[in-house]
Curated annotation (Swiss-Prot):
Name recorded for this polypeptide: tRNA/tmRNA (uracil-C(5))-methyltransferase
Enzyme kind, highest EC tier: transferase
Enzyme Commission numbers on file: 2.1.1.-, 2.1.1.35
GO BP, sorted A to Z: tRNA methylation
HAMAP family named in the record: RNA_methyltr_TrmA (MF_01011)
Annotated InterPro entries: MeTrfase_TrmA_AS (IPR030390), MeTrfase_TrmA_CS (IPR030391), SAM-dependent_MTases_sf (IPR029063), TrmA_MeTrfase (IPR011869), U5_MeTrfase_fam (IPR010280)
One Pfam family it belongs to: tRNA_U5-meth_tr
């Protein structure tokens, strides 16, 4: 992780700059007034990764200055959740005098939740042996006894040792209703828990009066699918990454939601299936008949690269498009195509990444009359 100047006194100023930037960027599309969703000013990041530096008997976390690439010591990290900050010094103290746990340890990754769970991954430049497992079990027990709801993972080349789980279970509150989400180590999750809740509430609000079914591309662990299911008869969601699909299935069952179906496909493959260019066995094997769906609304949350031209053209076939973007530059490129047929009816900024130039945006589009 790189330098981050977390300064609550600067929070409103940096937010105002983003509001101005996003408003100016989307002025050509006659977007309505921007809805702005703030982040907590500190302790907002549910994840953090640190390199580990060894100096004689000493051992501590470091980060790198993005401009100079110089390393600097980090004992606390105000961007990260309070849970991560509480654990950081205790973890280092517990490991620094233990040869088995400290030897060739080069990185520590933390994944925490609003629900109070935390997962710690210890990364090594050596193979892990039985002595490491014994010591790691004792470390886990010690931290559990100190009140941390914690699991541990040891990683080395081609090696992963899990004590006792490689995931956390997050609870997000959407308009007073709790949703539980399995979040697996090393797979994508929304980094800012409080803003993630606001994004879900906004998406639910945008689709309130919906008819028929919802199609969702790039659904990840089902983050949006589950909350949006209440507004639609059925939800058909696609995702390519296998661990995310498995988490999505877990989350559907855990939340007892019966009208969501996940299929493992890329957006590009799904476009081909929709257009009848190719038949896919996995649709048949899962008993999915695309023709039986009546999708007037499509939800997309693509990677930073946005959607390719063919996917944009397929998406244009839907009455309403809900688009969440972690990169407004590629959203703008996609809107050059989408705005030929649709106009923006809702426009939002979610401050997922305070004190950085990154912005998360949301637009609701409806077909022009």
């Amino acid at each position: 992780m790189a330098t981050l100047d977390v300064n609550p006194q600067r929070y409103q100023q940096q937010l105002a700059e983003k509001v101005q930037r996003l408003t100016d960027m989307f002025a050509p599309y006659q977007a309505p007034e921007l809805e702005v969703f703030e982040s907590p000013e500190q302790h907002y990041r549910m994840r953090a990764e640190f390199r580990v530096w060894h100096e004689g008997e000493e051992m501590y976390y470091i980060m790198f200055n993005q401009e100079t690439r110089e390393k600097y010591r980090v004992d606390q990290f105000p961007a990260a959740s309070r849970l991560i900050n509480d654990l950081m010094p205790l973890l280092i103290d517990a490991m620094k005098d233990n040869e088995s746990l400290r030897r060739k340890l080069f990185q520590v990754d933390f994944l925490s939740t609003l629900s109070g769970e935390i997962l710690v991954s210890l990364l090594y430049h050596r193979q892990l042996d039985d002595a490491w497992i014994e010591n790691a079990k004792a470390l886990k027990q010690r931290l559990n006894d100190e009140g941390f709801d914690l699991n541990l993972i040891g990683r080395a080349r081609k090696m992963k040792i899990v004590l006792d789980r490689d995931y956390v279970v997050e609870k997000l509150d959407v308009n007073g209703k709790p949703y539980v989400y399995q979040q697996v180590e090393n797979s994508f999750t929304q980094p800012n828990g409080k803003v993630a809740e606001k994004m879900l509430e906004w998406a639910v609000d945008c689709t309130q009066e919906s008819q028929g079914d919802l199609l969702e591309l790039y659904c990840g662990n089902g983050n949006f699918s589950l909350a949006l299911a209440q507004n639609f008869e059925r939800v058909l969601a696609t995702e390519l990454a296998k661990p995310s699909v498995e988490s999505a299935q877990y989350n559907i069952a855990a939340n007892k939601i019966e009208n969501v179906q996940i299929i493992r496909m890329s957006a590009e493959e799904f476009t081909e299936a929709m257009e009848g260019k190719r038949e896919f066995r996995r649709l048949k094997d899962n008993g999915i008949d695309l023709k039986s769906y009546n999708c007037n609304t499509i939800f997309v949350d693509p990677p930073r690269s946005g959607m390719d031209v063919d996917t944009c053209k397929m998406v244009q076939g839907y009455e309403r498009i809900l688009y969440i973007s972690c990169n407004p530059e590629t959203l703008k490129e996609n809107l050059d195509i989408l705005s030929e047929t649709h106009h923006i009816t809702r426009f939002a900024l979610f401050d997922q990444f305070p004190y950085t130039h990154h912005m998360e945006a949301g637009v609701m589009l409806e077909r022009k009359a």
